[in-house]
Amino acid sequence: MKKIAIDAMGGENAPKAIIDAVLKAKPKLKDIEFILFGDAEKINQLIPNEQKERIEVVATSEVIVDSDEPVRAIRRKKDSSMVVAANYVKAGKADALFSLGNTGALLACGIFIIGRIKGVERPALMPTLPSAKSEQGFNIIDVGANAQSKPEYLVQWAQMANFYAQKVRNIQNPTVALLNNGAEDDKGDPLHQEAYKLLKETKLNFIGNVEGNDLMEGKADVIVTDGFTGNATLKAIEGTASVILRLLKDSLLNNGLRPKVGALLAKPGLTALKKRFDTARYGGAVLLGVNAPVVKTHGRSNIRPIYYTLLQIDKMLSQDLVGEYKKYFSESR
């Protein structure tokens, strides 16, 4: 039976939303044990006695908050829920780490406590985002784990994301593209030009460059980019989506009766659109390249995205994704 180490104190709605999601996922994930780290008194109060089977609570006295400097926090807050959970994974007492807390601290836990897979130059952060073409969306890697990149890093990230798309998203032969400032072969700075050449030489189903305006069109299953560009791209997508949804809601509700009637008539279409661009069902962002699954969900998440992230982690464990990475990179050295 696999065990997921969960930072129960991370995020704005902790610990209640996390525990409610665990209780919702527990009947479906019959081969998973959940280890919750944090304020034991608060956590235990939220778990009915009849639901405590396969749930372990580990008491911790500290919490890493968003304002903490990541590396300093994991060194100084040794008894924080996130750090103790990471050490459980490192010691083999748990098989995966999940948190809604400080992203930088979680990345630091993954890289410095759980550790890199041998042969992986740099771990990278990868979410799944919605696209207009497919309900499965697309993966984009790296979105901020690395401020500086080399062409060889991008190739490894593409290889890891390709495995993920095959094993977790069930895409037999994922298409892989490089995010660049033009579709032509010779576009980009030296980093992207060299990465393009190296990607062409791999066995990946590499389809070339894609531009930023093509991302949401679903032209590729996997988009690889440097961490600086990826982070800026992700935040631009999230910010744009948030503004559009807010403006649409304001337009429909604050301009008299006609827009409200129109919204009622358009409700089936709007519902379908909302479902297509619902990111909750994709789960969390994954730190690929470390010795166990490390997954981050947005700090404002409620029960639903947390629930889907638990299902995502279960799939990663059942498919032995990290084992596949270790085998591949040991053979390629």
Swiss-Prot record:
Top EC class, one word: transferase
Main localization, broad class: cytoplasm
EC numbers for this chain: 2.3.1.274
Pfam families the record matches: FA_synthesis (PF02504)
BP terms from Gene Ontology: fatty acid biosynthetic process; phospholipid biosynthetic process
Cellular compartments annotated: Cytoplasm
GO cellular component term of the entry, any: cytoplasm
Top-level division of the source organism's lineage: Bacteria
Pathway named in the protein's UniProt entry: Lipid metabolism; phospholipid metabolism
Catalytic activity: a fatty acyl-[ACP] + phosphate = an acyl phosphate + holo-[ACP]
Keywords: Cytoplasm, Lipid biosynthesis, Lipid metabolism, Phospholipid biosynthesis, Phospholipid metabolism, Transferase
GO molecular function, one term: phosphate:acyl-[acyl carrier protein] acyltransferase activity
InterPro entries: FA_synthesis, Phospholipid_synth_PlsX-like
Similarity field: Belongs to the PlsX family.
Assembly information from the UniProt record: Homodimer. Probably interacts with PlsY.
Free-text function comment from the UniProt entry: Catalyzes the reversible formation of acyl-phosphate (acyl-PO(4)) from acyl-[acyl-carrier-protein] (acyl-ACP). This enzyme utilizes acyl-ACP as fatty acyl donor, but not acyl-CoA.
Protein name per UniProt: Phosphate acyltransferase
Source organism of this protein record: Lactobacillus gasseri (strain ATCC 33323 / DSM 20243 / BCRC 14619 / CIP 102991 / JCM 1131 / KCTC 3163 / NCIMB 11718 / NCTC 13722 / AM63)
